[in-house]
């Protein structure tokens, strides 16, 4: 666990494995943090140099007031600046893999369009980027996060997170506690509000899809995702026909939590194809 200064933004990240191995970068979703990936980055570190970062405005990273940070373009710039700061893309021959969940998938795809010579693999997990408007559960999520009464917010967040799972009984109380702990930090609600407004009504442009057609891509989706339903998985199929597609059965919006072993198997198999040292 480390902090690094990314162009003036104090940024938190987890790092595992040997820096000589290929870099695999994990990008979380809206209102989340690097801890959401749990043991997966560590497990992959036997063969990869894995890094899970807290986006600007989220987790333990700094939460600046400037609104430009909280657009897809702003987050993409932040990730590129982060990669440059930690040295992931400094070498001319450097190749990385990007793994993004939900909002993180949208950001990862955007980064891939800008760094297509550097991005070897792209993994989109229950990704946003094709929403025309917020889904009903996304609106509930926003309302819960914006609730100022801590007791009411706890109950609202608990209900929303339960609805994100295929089986609500799998939700650990600590996940609700962690969300409430982070959202109460100075600037966190501001970051959430701006990010929600800037990411749930915009889409990956056609040129963006064209730019990443030849990037090795895996799209993973929870079969019972209520936040970004599986119809968006079908829409990605049309936009990225060369990608590999996998549905995780009996999983909701975060299949890496509900079906960790199966998710890890799919992910590690994909990443292990043509794996090389730096």
Predicted regions and their residues:
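Active-site loop/oxyanion-hole signature of alpha/beta-hydrolase fold enzymes
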Residues: 6-9, 14, 55-99, 265
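Conserved HGGG/HGGXW glycine-rich cap/lid loop of the alpha/beta-hydrolase fold
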Residues: 9-12, 16-62
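Conserved alpha/beta-hydrolase catalytic His-Asp/Glu region
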Residues: 11, 152-211
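Gly/Ala-rich beta-loop-alpha elbow adjacent to hydrolase catalytic centers
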Residues: 100, 104, 108
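Flexible "cap/lid" loop of the alpha/beta hydrolase fold
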Residues: 109-113, 121-152
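Short beta-strand/loop motif that positions the catalytic acidic residue
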Residues: 212, 219-221
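Acidic catalytic loop of the alpha/beta-hydrolase fold
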Residues: 224-228
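Catalytic active-site module of serine/aspartate enzymes centered on a nucleophile-bearing elbow/loop
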Residues: 243-278
């Amino acid at each position: 666990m480390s902090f690094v200064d990314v162009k003036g933004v104090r940024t938190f990240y987890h790092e595992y494995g040997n820096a000589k191995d290929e870099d695999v970068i994990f990008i979380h979703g809206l209102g989340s943090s690097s801890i959401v990936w749990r043991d997966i980055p560590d497990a992959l570190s036997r063969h990869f140099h894995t890094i899970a970062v807290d986006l600007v405005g989220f987790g333990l990273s700094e939460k600046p007031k400037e609104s430009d940070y909280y657009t897809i373009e702003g987050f993409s710039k932040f990730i590129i600046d982060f990669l440059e700061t930690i040295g992931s893309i400094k070498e001319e021959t450097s190749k990385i893999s990007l793994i993004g969940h939900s909002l993180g998938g949208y950001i990862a795809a955007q980064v891939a369009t800008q760094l297509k010579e550097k991005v070897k693999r792209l993994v989109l997990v229950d990704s946003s980027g094709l929403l025309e408007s917020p889904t009903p559960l996304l609106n509930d999520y926003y309302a819960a996060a914006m609730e100022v009464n801590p007791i009411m917010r706890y109950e609202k967040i608990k209900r929303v997170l339960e609805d994100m799972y295929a089986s609500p009984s799998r939700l650990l109380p600590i996940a609700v506690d962690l969300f409430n702990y982070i959202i109460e930090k100075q600037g966190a609600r501001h970051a959430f509000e701006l990010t929600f407004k800037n990411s749930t009504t915009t889409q990956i442009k056609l040129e963006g899809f064209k730019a990443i057609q030849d990037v090795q891509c895996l799209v993973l989706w929870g079969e019972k995702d209520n936040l970004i339903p599986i119809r968006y998985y079908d829409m990605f199929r049309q936009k990225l026909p060369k990608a590999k597609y996998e549905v995780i059965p009996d999983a909701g919006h975060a299949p890496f939590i509900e079906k960790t072993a199966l998710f890890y198997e799919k992910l590690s198999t994909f990443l292990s194809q043509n794996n090389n040292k730096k």
